[in-house]
Amino acid sequence: MVYPIRLYGDPVLRRKARPVEDFSGIKRLAEDMLETMFEAKGVGLAAPQIGLSQRLFVAVEYADEPEGEEERPLRELVRRVYVVANPVITYREGLVEGTEGCLSLPGLYSEEVPRAERIRVEYQDEEGRGRVLELEGYMARVFQHEIDHLDGILFFERLPKPKREAFLEANRAELVRFQKEARALLKELSQG
C-alpha cells in the first residue's frame, strides 16, 4: 500500500512521536512504508510522514547504478534495508555540512545542513530485537534526518539561524503551497 506523504504544515510532522510498543504489525507497516518511499524516490521515510505518530522509520542503502545501463527501478538497486524502531543516538563524532531534502518538502534542499559525521544508534528491528549500528557519512546523515522526524524536527531547522531565515524566505511560496496541500489532505482524510 502506498500512503500519501504528509507535507510541511501537517501537525503530525511537528510532534514528538510515541514509542513503538506493539511490534505485531510493524513488518507489514515497514513494507508499506518502503513501497511509499520507493514511489517517491526517497532514501528514508519516517512514520510521521505517513501520518503515524510512532518512533519508526525505514531507510535504504542503494548500490551505484552501473554506467551505461538503462535506468533501473530503485527497488532493484537496494543494497541494504533498515527498519528502525525507537532509535537512540548514543554517540556522535565530528561535524560536517551536507545536502538534504525531504519527501515532506518536495523539491526543497539545503547544501549546508550540519550533522555528526559518525554516530552509534541503538534501536529495535521490526521484530522488537535490540540492535546497535555504527554509521558514518551519508547513512549517518540519513539516520539523523529520520530520527529528527520522530522528534518533530525538519532539516532546515538544523541550519544556523541566518541560513534558516534565508531558506524560509527563499522558499516562502513553496512552503505556503505545502501548507495548503497539507490542510486539504487532512480535510480529505477526515471526510473519508
Swiss-Prot record:
CDD domains recorded: Pep_deformylase
Enzyme class: hydrolase
Swiss-Prot/TrEMBL cofactor(s): Fe(2+)
Binding locations of Fe cation: C102, H145, H149
Residues at the active site: E146
Gene Ontology molecular function, alphabetical: metal ion binding; peptide deformylase activity
Keywords: Hydrolase, Iron, Metal-binding, Protein biosynthesis
Enzyme Commission number, as recorded: 3.5.1.88
GO terms classed as biological process: co-translational protein modification; translation
A Pfam family: Pep_deformylase
Reaction catalyzed: N-terminal N-formyl-L-methionyl-[peptide] + H2O = N-terminal L-methionyl-[peptide] + formate
NCBIfam families (UniProt xref): pept_deformyl (TIGR00079), PRK00150.1-3 (NF001159)
Functional note: Removes the formyl group from the N-terminal Met of newly synthesized proteins. Requires at least a dipeptide for an efficient rate of reaction. N-terminal L-methionine is a prerequisite for activity but the enzyme has broad specificity at other positions.
Protein name stated in the entry: Peptide deformylase
Organism lineage: Bacteria, Thermotogati, Deinococcota, Deinococci, Thermales
